């Protein structure tokens, strides 16, 4: 009996600790979600909303009503069948089908849990996803989310409203990014987007794009939908500093490599390879007509996005 009582007390204590830890974790998550909400909503309201709106204008025109012709109306819109039947000229009125469906695909593989300065790659990805989500609902669009690594880990179908967007952000923040050795499969994310997006949609693909086996699938997705890639890379990939002898861990393969960064020759080679990879990827995207934004973890991403969307609006 004493041992049973002791076990009960131990279980009760463990449960209380679990409840306390859950409460603390929930508070931390809510705090982080709130911080992201305040920052990204302010960006949307102050800078970004108009640029988003001018880029995404709905699926086209849809029939609204038939009404009598009044002087000044466009005669090309006359409905001759109704005009003949009533003996009075009537017009067919069309309205822009404004509502869009937006899907945000976020790479949550292990390579995103890296950051040499203030941001992890995934942290920047989450903030950009939140900003795009608030832009979508401000535009009266539906927005959905898919988290992927080498499989689709979570999918939330597109809906409207602030509560829905806060749920999206909470689910991203609450995701287990520390689970080691999650690999990247862009092809898996693209195949999933093709499968679930029946009507033309706006699709944002946020990743570091370390995987390179998806070009045919991307061409097809880009043909059917309005797809924009956001490639997030770390600041050290562009400008590698002298950090002494360091151990570099590949979070997707689990491999470790020692590098002597005191050698300028090694630093220059690393930097040259990284820049060549970024430039080569950008060129491939351009060749298939895929819109790409490349953003470093220490860049002012708001400025980059605004420049991109303004340039894109001028093209259309």
What are these regions (language model features)?
Residues 108, 209, 232:
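Residues immediately flanking
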Residues 103, 146, 204, 228-230, ...:
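Hydrophobic/aromatic beta-strand patches that form the interior of the parallel beta-sheet core
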Residues 1-13:
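Single conserved hydrophobic/aromatic residue that forms the stacking wall/gate
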Residues 85-86, 209-213:
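Short beta->alpha connector loops
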Residues 18, 22-156, 202:
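An amphipathic, basic-hydrophobic helix/alpha-beta surface used to engage anionic
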């Amino acid at each position: 009996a004493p041992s049973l009582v002791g076990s009960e007390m131990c279980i009760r204590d463990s449960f209380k600790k679990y409840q306390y830890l859950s409460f603390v974790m929930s508070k931390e998550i809510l705090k982080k979600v709130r911080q992201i909400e305040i920052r990204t909503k302010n960006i949307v309201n102050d800078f970004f909303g108009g640029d988003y709106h001018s880029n995404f204008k709905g699926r086209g025109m849809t029939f609204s009503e038939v009404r009598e012709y009044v002087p000044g109306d466009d005669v090309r819109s006359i409905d001759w069948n109704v005009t003949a039947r009533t003996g009075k000229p009537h017009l067919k009125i069309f309205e822009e089908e404004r509502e869009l469906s937006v899907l945000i695909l976020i790479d949550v593989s292990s390579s995103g849990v890296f950051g040499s300065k203030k941001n992890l790659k995934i942290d920047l990805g989450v903030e950009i996803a939140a900003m795009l989500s608030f832009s979508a609902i401000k535009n009266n669009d539906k927005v959905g989310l898919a988290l992927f690594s080498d499989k689709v880990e979570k999918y939330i179908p597109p809906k409207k409203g602030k509560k829905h967007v806060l749920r999206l952000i909470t689910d991203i923040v609450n995701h287990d990014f520390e689970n080691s050795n999650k690999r990247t499969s862009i092809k898996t994310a693209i195949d999933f987007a093709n499968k679930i997006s029946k009507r033309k949609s706006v699709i944002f693909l946020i990743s570091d794009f370390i995987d390179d086996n998806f070009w045919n699938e991307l061409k097809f997705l880009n043909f059917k939908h309005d797809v924009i890639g956001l490639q997030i890379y770390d600041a050290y990939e562009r400008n590698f500093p002298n950090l002494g002898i360091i151990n570099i861990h590949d979070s997707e393969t689990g491999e470790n490599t020692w590098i002597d960064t005191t050698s300028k020759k090694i630093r220059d080679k690393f930097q040259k390879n990284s820049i060549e990879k970024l430039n080569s990827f950008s060129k491939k995207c351009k060749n298939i007509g895929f819109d790409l934004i490349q953003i470093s973890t220490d860049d002012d991403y708001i400025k980059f996005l605004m420049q991109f969307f303004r340039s894109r609006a001028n093209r259309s």
